[in-house]
From Swiss-Prot:
HAMAP family: UPF0502 (MF_01584)
InterPro entries per the UniProt record, alphabetical: DUF480, WH-like_DNA-bd_sf, WH_DNA-bd_sf
PANTHER family, A to Z: UPF0502 PROTEIN YCEH
Gene3D superfamilies the UniProt entry points to: Winged helix-like DNA-binding domain superfamily/Winged helix DNA-binding domain
Coiled coil: none
Species: Azotobacter vinelandii (strain DJ / ATCC BAA-1303)
Name the UniProt record assigns to this protein: UPF0502 protein Avin_04790
Similarity comment text for this entry: Belongs to the UPF0502 family.
Source organism superkingdom: Bacteria
Transmembrane segments: none
Amino acid sequence: MSDRAETPSVREPFNAIEVRILGCLIEKQATTPESYPLTLNALVLACNQKSSREPLMNLASGQVGQGLRQLEGRSLVELVMGSRADRWEHRLDKALQLTPPQLSLLGLLLLRGPQTVNELLTRSARLYAFDDGEELQHQLERLIGRELVCRLPRQPGQREERYMHRLGSAEDLEELLAARATQAAVNEGAAGGRIEALEARIAELETRLAKLEEDLGSGEPRG
């Protein structure tokens, strides 16, 4: 697939429910192909899954159904009529002209928020088998070049850069960055408090040790 430009409607920001729907459809297409496309009930369960999701959500079927209709209006999902139940499939790879490795990365970022290269490499194993982190990094750079992904500023205490999708609104991005900056400050403060407590404990032990040595040194030898 090429990196040609997509239609403007595709790049209009998604809301949080639409982001979750697309991420779930991408994930389940790769991990449970026998049950894909998904019924509405299966998609609701996937959206509310307690593992591999950030943030956790508790969506009603009506909310998911409305999100599907909005995405269908932008040709990003398609209804597949079935004899027992109607099912839904995504068309994000076609709409954005994504290769399989790019689709897997975007799906992970939609589902789990900002992640490091190592986190993406570990978590992508079920979706796409990257040879190594270098290959994954190359695909991230291509997505960055198309403004589908961005590299986040490193927060205090973080050793690796994190990457985030850019399919949500600018307000969502700012809110997430603010929340993560606050959490980083809290973590740093907590770590600082623990260090101060340890230093105080060490100083106390050193004082007690010095006194013990002094007492032993002043004692008279036994004959």
